[in-house]
Amino acid sequence: FIRAAKIYADFSSFDVEEAGRIELEADYTSSEFNTLQELEFKNDFGKLIIARINSLRGRGDYLTLKVGTLFHSAELDNEFGLIRINEVMPATQSIKINSEYTGVQLGISPEWEFLHEIDLEFASLKSSLNLDYKIQRTESTKKYYQGFHLNENTTNSLHITSEFGSVKLTSNP
C-alpha cells in the first residue's frame, strides 16, 4: 500500500496495486492502478488504466484513459485520445470533462441523480439514459443539452464540453 507518492515516469510502464494519493507526471508511459483514493495527473502520449478510484483529476494529450469504477468525482481535460469510465456509481458528486478530438464513454448507474450540461462542437451525443432536457439546441455544427437525470434538485453534476469527438452515455446496471 502506498499512502502518498509523486511518480515521474517517461518511456515506462508500471503497476500499482493499492494507493491513497498519487501525483503522476508521465510521458509515453503505460500506468496501471488497481485501487486508488485520489489521483492527480499530467500524462501525454500514453495509457492510464484505473480499476477503482474515488477522485480523479488531470490532463492528457494523446492519452487513453480507462477507469473501471468511479466513486466520487472526476475532472478531466484531454486532447486526442479516449476517456472511458465503465461505471459511475450513484454517490458520485461531479464529473467535468473538457475534450478535443477525444471519444468520451461513460457507463452510468441508473440510480445516479445528476444535473447535466453537455456542450458539443463538431461532436455527437448518444445516450441510453432517460435524460430530461430543459434546454436542447441543435445547430449545424453545435449541440447543447442541459437538464437532469432523475432529480432536478440534486447537487450532483455532469459537465461535458467536447470538440470533434463523440460522447456516449450508457446505463450501467
What are these regions (language model features)?
Residues 1-173:
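Intrinsically disordered, low-complexity terminal regions
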